[in-house]
């Protein structure tokens, strides 16, 4: 069998121009490394090593594209092909800047600040304190379910509350927090920023952020902020100047049309879209010392870029890769170990292969196929008949297409503030919910928990209303009597395994033969393996003698299970 993954690159995170040893595990005795340079394919003879073949080449470009020529054919990212593969089926290697080591396989926890925990009640906005969308905002009681007013509803969670919750998060095993936007905004979701230089006073202001950052640093934990750099809020002074004065310098920061209309996020008029063709936009968001992407790296460890796939010029995503790359480089100039990943809601591969970001929210390559398989419905509630084998092929295809260095920094999720919660989509089926999360933690990438999933937080609306926002943004239930303690124990075990088993954190992904209806794969690193099996309804599995990592017991022969992570003992 042929096998090539990140562990076969030495060094795995090279500088541009640095020589890299590229290895292939294979039974073949001879082969060539073919790599693309300046539009031509070049050959490098491979020499034997104890596990197969190897060759040394300088990384002249990023991405550096290559494929192996063996006696039986060409071995590329998607396996063996008899004829030369397309370039998109070559392996893609990137040179620095690359994801920081701390982020590889790290366990993330997403927090929607207004709904997580209230630390200082005096910070909660008063009922009707201002108008949003022409209507007064609403102060809601913590135990009230979210309603149709959505962004107008304030529960009063703040950064002091997040600080208070750190012992809970540390006990869970979380390594990094991702906070949805924290900068001043008139809405509770804060995706319509009106001041990038000011942490929202209703969240505790910069004082609370500094305290939170310091406490996280002391615990060895990281903080990721949400960078809303595709658009601003309509109340932002820059947009107000542009709107009122066509001769103002700010006018060029936005795209106005002859009829007076302007480009906005999804046509939502209170979120006018930035134009990165503007020198002023570039100065204020990328180049300037006080550009938010730079300034806040003094109090955080990275960014999640909102609607990263849409950012660009002229009211479009033109030159998207260029500007994503520039934002990421700016953050890393301020903090060398910064992590910058994007909300790439669809196929993330083309953007990531262009050496732009450190990773992406793994919707298309993980969350959507897994939840479609286990729930029988797609993201929008439409029936889907997806079999385990089909789901596996989708997962593997996306994994194989990723640049090797980004396979372990994908923000891998099942629930978020934008999509229905996983437990709700599974209609409260706790065993399928466990199966989904066991799969998430067994899969390559950085597993991400959405606040409350670990205690069984779901949502109140009926299934006739199949929607994420606002129902997926319910407040965290801090009354422990409301927690599903069995789920919480299960999540703590999953987190512990991800953190303590290098093969689960950094291992490659390989197929594993399994019965019909079972999604199965192997993780492999340095000759060690974990076998992973998942079945929607449960299955009888024939397994070698090994340690069941979740149940912490030895098994062998025939085993009945919905999910099984097995470390072979033979």
Q: Where on the chain are the PLM-derived regions?
A:
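Short amphipathic
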Residues: 53-56
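Active-site and adjacent substrate-binding regions of carbohydrate-active enzymes
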Residues: 2-13, 20, 24, 30, ...
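Conserved aromatic beta-strand anchor motif in extracellular beta-sandwich/beta-rich domains
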Residues: 33-37
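Short beta-strand and strand-turn-strand segments in soluble, beta-rich domains
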Residues: 39-41
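Surface-exposed, short loops/turns at beta-strand junctions within beta-sandwich domains
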Residues: 58-63
């Amino acid at each position: 069998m042929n096998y090539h993954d990140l562990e076969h690159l030495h060094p795995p995170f090279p500088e541009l121009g640095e020589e890299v040893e590229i290895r292939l595990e294979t039974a073949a005795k001879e082969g060539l490394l073919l790599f693309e340079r300046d539009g031509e394919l070049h050959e490098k003879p491979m020499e034997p090593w104890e596990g197969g073949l190897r060759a040394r080449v300088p990384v002249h470009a990023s991405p550096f594209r290559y494929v192996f020529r063996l006696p039986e054919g060409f071995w590329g990212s998607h396996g063996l092909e008899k004829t030369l593969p397309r370039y998109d089926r070559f392996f893609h290697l990137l040179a620095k800047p690359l994801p920081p080591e701390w982020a590889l396989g790290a366990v993330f926890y997403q927090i929607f600040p207004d709904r997580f925990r209230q630390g200082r009640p005096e910070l909660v906005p008063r009922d009707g304190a201002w108008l949003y969308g022409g209507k007064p905002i609403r102060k809601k009681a913590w135990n009230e379910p979210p309603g149709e007013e959505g962004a107008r509803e304030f529960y009063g969670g703040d950064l002091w509350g997040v600080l208070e919750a750190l012992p809970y998060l540390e006990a869970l095993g979380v390594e990094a927090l991702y906070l949805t936007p924290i900068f001043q905004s008139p809405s509770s979701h804060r995706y319509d920023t009106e001041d990038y230089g000011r942490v929202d006073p209703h969240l505790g202001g910069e004082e609370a952020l500094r305290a939170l950052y310091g406490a996280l640093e002391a615990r060895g934990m990281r903080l990721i902020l949400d960078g809303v750099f595709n658009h601003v809020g309509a109340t932002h002074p820059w947009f107000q100047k542009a709107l009122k004065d066509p001769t103002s310098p700010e006018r060029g920061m936005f795209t106005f049309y002859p009829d007076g209309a302007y480009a906005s996020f999804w046509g939502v008029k209170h979120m006018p879209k930035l134009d990165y063709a503007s020198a002023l936009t570039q100065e204020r968001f990328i180049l300037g010392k006080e550009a938010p992407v730079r300034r806040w790296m003094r109090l955080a460890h990275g960014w999640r870029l909102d609607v990263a796939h849409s950012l660009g010029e002229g009211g479009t995503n033109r030159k998207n890769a260029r500007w994503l790359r520039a934002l990421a480089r700016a953050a890393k100039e301020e903090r060398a170990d910064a992590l910058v990943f994007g909300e790439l809601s669809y196929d993330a591969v083309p953007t990531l292969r262009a050496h732009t970001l450190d990773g992406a929210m793994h919707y298309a390559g993980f969350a959507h196929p897994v939840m479609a398989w286990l729930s029988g419905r797609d993201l929008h509630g439409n029936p889907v008949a997806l079999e385990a084998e089909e789901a596996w092929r989708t997962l593997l295809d996306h994994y194989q297409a990723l640049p090797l260095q980004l396979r372990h920094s994908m923000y891998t999720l099942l629930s978020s503030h934008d999509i229905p919660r996983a437990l709700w989509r599974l209609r409260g089926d706790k065993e399928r919910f466990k199966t989904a999360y066991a799969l998430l933690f067994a899969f390559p990438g950085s597993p991400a928990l959405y606040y409350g999933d670990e205690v069984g937080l779901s949502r109140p609306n009926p299934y006739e209303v199949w929607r994420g926002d606002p129902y997926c943004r319910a407040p965290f239930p801090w009354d422990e009597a409301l927690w599903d303690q069995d789920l919480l124990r299960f999540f703590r075990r999953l987190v512990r395994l991800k953190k303590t088993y290098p093969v689960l954190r950094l291992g490659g992904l390989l197929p594993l033969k399994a019965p019909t209806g079972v999604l199965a794969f192997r993780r492999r690193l340095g000759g060690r393996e974990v076998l992973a099996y998942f079945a929607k309804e449960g299955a009888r599995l024939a397994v070698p003698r090994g340690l069941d990592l979740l149940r912490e017991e030895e098994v062998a022969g025939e085993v009945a299970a919905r999910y099984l992570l097995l470390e072979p003992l033979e």
